Amino acid sequence: MTARTDPGALRHDWTREELQALFDLPFNDLLFEAQLVHRRWFKADEVQMSTLLSIKTGGCPEDCGYCAQSSKFDTGLKASKLMEVEKVLAEARKAKEAGATRYCMGAAWREPKDRDMDMVCAMVEGIKDMGMETCMTLGMLSGQQVHRLAQSGLDYYNHNIDTSEEYYPKVISTRTYQDRLETLERVRNAGINVCSGGIVGMGESPSDRIGMLMTLANLEEHPQSVPINMLMPVEGTALGASEKIDPIDFVRLIAVARIAMPQSVVRLSAGREHMSEETQALCFLAGANSIFIGEKLLTTKNPEADKDQRLFAKLGIRSMPAHSCPSEKDVSADRKAG
């Protein structure tokens, strides 16, 4: 049975042909189907507001072609040390006051050092005590590090697959696609919710975008959170001169992600700064139900808060409460056990 005969049914056996057929539907039909799926599992007028903070910026030894924080590229970005716990918690309080219900923290590492885990876990615990969802993106993790994060009560771990397996070697050479999948499996097996998506506009083909969604939708469990990023080219990086993806194609991708992963929160991540209000509205209609608020996403620009507030008011959108994802796993037991 396909999603088209049972809107919102969970599947893990999507074929490339099925996903391509969805993408190729007449635009109105595709959005209608995505809305049917979306309304089965979520409130259609709710969008989660998240905030992303770079807790350790620059100096990363990886060569991800899109990233301003790679030490392989001259982007003018100065490397910094891991932020102090209290400073991170202070920023989290500001984010909550601004309306965020989810707090994400990113560190420019290949993988964290064991000596950093005490501070990282203290950040998680402090932010959870504020009542917000917590998410970390720290690169690859050892089994012991995953266990530490689970004990701290981390709700989500982000590790994007970035693109299709076929196109991946053209973007990154210092970490394999399989490395990423193994990290996701390690996180999932520890009981932490998975946040994983990708980036479009890196020169990949439409088929590569479908391949990326197929990989995510056919995982043992769908990622509870699926961020879709529109590349914001950074001068000095390998992909600094990339052309933008067509907005309608981007909306189509959001709709296919919603249909293929019906219980996942689909997040409009990087790139909103260059999206019109109309494009964002179509993305919400297609099933996107999370955004990042705040003036910066790690090192790139993001729409100012008042612009988002005006757009939400125009569209009649309300803030989604924390822990509204229907497939989210409760991590509180892990924290108590720790």
UniProtKB/Swiss-Prot annotation:
Coiled coil: none annotated. Pathway: Cofactor biosynthesis; biotin biosynthesis; biotin from 7,8-diaminononanoate: step 2/2. The gene is bioB. Its cofactor is [4Fe-4S] cluster; [2Fe-2S] cluster. The keyword Transmembrane does not apply. It comes from Parvibaculum lavamentivorans (strain DS-1 / DSM 13023 / NCIMB 13966). InterPro entries: Aldolase_TIM, BATS_dom, Biotin_synth/BioAB, Biotin_synthase, Elp3/MiaA/NifB-like_rSAM, rSAM. It catalyses: (4R,5S)-dethiobiotin + (sulfur carrier)-SH + 2 reduced [2Fe-2S]-[ferredoxin] + 2 S-adenosyl-L-methionine = (sulfur carrier)-H + biotin + 2 5'-deoxyadenosine + 2 L-methionine + 2 oxidized [2Fe-2S]-[ferredoxin]. It comes from the Bacteria. The lineage of its organism: Bacteria, Pseudomonadati, Pseudomonadota, Alphaproteobacteria, Hyphomicrobiales. Its EC number is 2.8.1.6. CDD domains: Radical_SAM. One of its GO terms (molecular function) is biotin synthase activity. Binds 1 [4Fe-4S] cluster. The cluster is coordinated with 3 cysteines and an exchangeable S-adenosyl-L-methionine. Binds 1 [2Fe-2S] cluster. The cluster is coordinated with 3 cysteines and 1 arginine. Homodimer. [4Fe-4S] cluster binds at C60, C64, C67. PANTHER family: BIOTIN SYNTHASE, BIOTIN SYNTHASE, MITOCHONDRIAL. The keyword Repressor does not apply. Pfam families: BATS, Radical_SAM. This is Biotin synthase. Catalyzes the conversion of dethiobiotin (DTB) to biotin by the insertion of a sulfur atom into dethiobiotin via a radical-based mechanism.
